[in-house]
Regions:
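Acidic, glycine/GT-rich loop-and beta-edge segments that sit at the periphery of enzyme/chaperone cores
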Residues: 2-7, 23-25, 262-342
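Non-transmembrane, aqueous-exposed alpha-helical and coiled segments at domain scale
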Residues: 31-39, 96-99, 112, 198, ...
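Phosphate/ATP-binding catalytic cores across multiple sugar-kinase/actin-like superfamilies
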Residues: 7-10, 14, 193-216
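Catalytic phosphate/nucleotide-handling subdomain of diverse soluble enzymes
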Residues: 54-59, 73, 206, 210-277
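Short, surface-exposed loop/turn segments at secondary-structure boundaries that line and modulate
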Residues: 109-111, 164-166, 170-185, 223-240
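Glycine-rich phosphate-binding loop of actin/hexokinase-like ATP-binding domains
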Residues: 9-12, 20-23, 34-129, 231-253
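A glycine-rich phosphate-binding loop feature that marks nucleotide/adenosyl-phosphate handling sites
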Residues: 44-46, 150-160, 216-227, 276-288
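Gly/charged contiguous loops adjacent to phosphate- or pyrophosphate-bearing nucleotide/cofactor binding elements
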Residues: 131-196
Length: 342
């Protein structure tokens, strides 16, 4: 597996080892109040490293998310460099997008964007951008819970156009903003790549929750270069992580690097992490039969069965369709939609 020195450094810098050692009375009050505080930290990368602490235990696992979160396997994907779309909002009434690119302060619908973007251009979509656009497509009802763009229960939009046997969403058309460059589409294959990645991550988390015997998490930290830049609300909408109080889903930055620095500067910290590492229970996701079941359920957006009551206090979520089961439209075949504007 990929649980090693990086994970140990994350545990050190985030204090997960201390969380597991605290008595219930020394921790913030969870809900319900008769149980101990549970913390989750995820270092998001090609292999996500997951650490869950609570009930006097620390559990860790690695989940194979692949490179989609870093812009790879995405048709217009790229690294997080100037010109890359990093933030996206889609109007739920019109279906029209607005976005922000790295290196340019105004959003695409604000004065000054075109002038500022001439130097960089709009070159692609980075990891944080693809997370937001997929979540926004679902929130705007342009994509169904199975991840199908232009699904039978979604609403029509001129931004959705035929693309072979499926549909794609037009995120950027340079002619609309007076810029050079090519159109940027979000394709059905892009959606599927993100679904596979996020399902692997969620399944790994859920597996650790099963081993700890819990159904809720009180605090979530997103670590790593990618985890530091994604919007936590959109990450939860997509279903990267289980439901949690939105105020307690935060970025913890380069936790592995911070932990390495602490270990270099403190002998007592090095001794502490040695002791904690001996107590960490490593779970091999590949050997767990339940992993596949969790993975399949997590392919839906945000999830096939899990509820998100905490998230619902912050953002209005679409009603979950019961018309079709997850996987019923996995073939990706293009379907005609009545009244769809093309």
């Amino acid at each position: 597996g990929h649980v090693g020195a990086d994970t140990a450094a994350v545990v050190l810098s985030t204090g997960l080892g201390q969380t597991a050692e605290l008595e219930a009375g020394d921790q913030p009050t969870p809900s319900p109040p008769d149980r101990e505080w549970v913390r989750l930290v995820v270092d998001v990368g090609t292999n996500a490293e997951i650490v869950l602490a609570g009930r006097g235990r620390v559990l860790a696992a690695s989940s194979p998310t692949g490179p989609a979160f870093e812009g790879a396997q995405i048709s217009a994907g790229q690294r997080a460099t100037p010109g890359a779309i990093e933030r996206v909002r889609i109007d739920p009434t019109t279906g029209e997008p607005r976005f922000r690119i790295i290196g340019v302060e105004p959003w695409s619908d604000e004065d000054g964007f075109t002038k500022a973007a001439i130097g960089t251009g709009v070159t692609g979509i980075c990891g944080s951008g693809i997370i937001e656009v997929v979540a926004e497509l679902w929130l705007a009802n342009l994509m169904d819970t199975n991840g199908v763009i232009g699904g039978a229960d979604t609403r029509p939009s001129t931004r959705i156009e035929p693309d072979g046997r499926t549909f794609s969403y037009v995120l950027f058309d340079p002619t609309e903003l007076g810029l050079d460059g090519e159109r940027l589409l979000v394709t059905q294959n892009d959606i599927r790549a993100i679904q596979l990645a996020k399902a692997a991550l969620y399944a790994g988390i859920r597996l650790l929750m099963d081993h700890l015997g819990i159904d809720t998490i009180d605090e979530i930290g997103l670590a790593g270069a990618f985890g530091s830049h994604i919007d936590t609300i959109h990450a939860t909408v997509l279903g990267l992580v289980p439901d949690c109080d939105p105020d307690r889903v935060t970025s913890v930055g380069n936790a592995a690097g911070a932990g390495a620095t602490i270990a270099l500067l403190s002998g007592s910290a090095r001794q502490s992490i040695i002791e904690v590492v001996d107590r960490i229970e490593k779970i091999e996701t590949a050997l767990e039969p339940a992993f596949q079941d969790h993975f399949v359920d997590a392919m839906a957006i945000p999830h096939r069965t899990a509820e998100y009551p905490c998230l619902s206090t912050r953002i209005t979520l679409p009603e979950r369709s019961t018309a079709s089961a997850v996987g019923s439209e996995r073939s990706g075949r293009r379907r005609r939609r009545n009244g769809a504007a093309r």
